[in-house]
Amino acid sequence: MSIAGLVASRIRDIPDFPQPGVVFKDITPLLADAGAFGQTIEYLADWLDRVGAELVVGIEARGFILAAPAALQAGLGFVPLRKPGKLPGVTLRESYALEYGEAALEMHEDAIRAGTRVAVMDDVLATGGTAAAAADLLERAGAQVVGLSFLIELAALKGRAKLPGRDLDCLLTVL
């Protein structure tokens, strides 16, 4: 079975979560299957090597679950992008619009040296707002974003449109 088929077989649809009309893509069955999760992490570590990443960035919260073990497998460091107010010390912040309101991501000001080749990981590419904010924040910090990887792309939400010219890796694309 292909890695995409394996991931697809371990994703559970939860209808009407977190609100009516939304079908939530639950990755916990994938995480609970050590073999499938391990193969997924190996795939992600190989992708990190292919894009020439020097550092891996995970987006809170489920991006941490993927990025940290993939970084370790690839022999790279890991940097978390957090929700506001979760990191002590001096931080950089990038705000972005949501359908109804605003959100933001933060990172430690000194987490990344200028010119470092970074790869970003998260579980789902939906509207692209969070991923675009992450890339913008990292570039403002001086990093070179070499790629963004997602387990699942929700193609109907057109997140790719907010990431023009970016190297994207999506294991599973659903409509």
Question: Which residue ranges define each predicted feature?
Answer:
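Active-site-facing substrate-recognition patch
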Residues: 1-53, 103
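PRPP-dependent phosphoribosyltransferase catalytic core
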Residues: 3, 9, 132-175
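Solvent-exposed alpha-helices and their adjacent loops that cap or buttress functional pockets
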Residues: 50, 97, 109-113, 141, ...
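Short glycine-rich phosphate-binding loop at a beta-alpha junction
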Residues: 52-60
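Conserved acidic residues
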Residues: 54, 116, 146
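Short Gly/Thr/Asp-enriched flexible loops that form oxyanion-binding sites at enzyme active sites
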Residues: 65-74, 135
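Short, glycine/charge-rich flexible loops or terminal/linker lids adjacent to PRPP-binding catalytic cores
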Residues: 76-118
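Conserved G/P- and acidic residue-centered "switch" motifs that form tight phosphate/ATP-binding loops
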Residues: 123, 128
